[in-house]
Design a protein with these regions (language model features):
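Short amphipathic alpha-helices and their capping/turn segments at secondary-structure boundaries
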Residues: 60-64, 95-103, 141-145
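Active-site glycine- and acidic-residue-rich loops that bind
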Residues: 49-53, 81-82, 89, 127-136
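Short, acidic/polar
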Residues: 25-31, 88-102
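Conserved N-terminal beta1-alpha1 strand-loop-helix module at the mouth
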Residues: 1-74, 79-85
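Conserved, mostly hydrophobic/aromatic
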Residues: 55, 100, 112
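Conserved anion-binding
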Residues: 114-151
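Receiver (REC) domain switch/active-site residues of two-component response regulators
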Residues: 106
Length: 151
């Protein structure tokens, strides 16, 4: 079976704000994407597994559209997660793997170039020089994703 991944990055930002979106209002963007491709994806589903990775603002809308012929992916997860008797979930700006799984995600992206660059810049800004720390942090994300059942 083939695996096809579509990462939509931040293509939802309207062109009037400097983005590239001219196809639908941001609140209806995921719905537009899915309605535009789901017929073709259903026809291909016997030969290929197709995953669409949406920006976090569109995960709920995408999951609600119904995953017929496609899987849902998020664009990253935090290196820590909630646990019974542990952290109760105060991850204000972080997407935990369990939260993404609970919303219906099947896959996540870990270690894309923007994330690697951002982590490296944070380490350097703090005076650090061990950029292998980026790989160690990303490994924590991989572990959290697997624990949550994400691929």
């Amino acid at each position: 079976m083939e695996h096809i991944f579509l990462n939509l990055k931040r293509f939802d930002i309207p062109s009037s704000l400097g983005g590239v979106n001219s196809i639908a209002p941001p609140a209806k963007w995921a719905e537009y994407i899915i309605s535009s491709v789901k017929g073709e994806l259903a026809a291909m589903s016997a030969d290929a597994e197709f995953t669409i990775f949406f920006p976090e603002a569109h995960i709920i809308e995408a999951a609600a559209a119904g995953k017929e012929g496609w899987l849902l992916g998020c664009q990253g997860v935090h290196r820590f997660d909630v646990a019974p008797g542990g952290n109760f979930g105060a991850f204000t700006t972080g997407r935990t793997a369990k939260s993404m799984a609970a919303l219906g995600c099947d896959y996540t992206i870990i270690g894309h170039c923007e994330e690697r660059r951002d982590l490296g810049e944070i380490i350097s800004e703090g005076g650090g020089t061990d950029l292998n720390a980026v790989n160690r942090i990303l490994n924590q994300e991989v572990l959290r994703a697997r624990e949550a059942g994400l691929k």
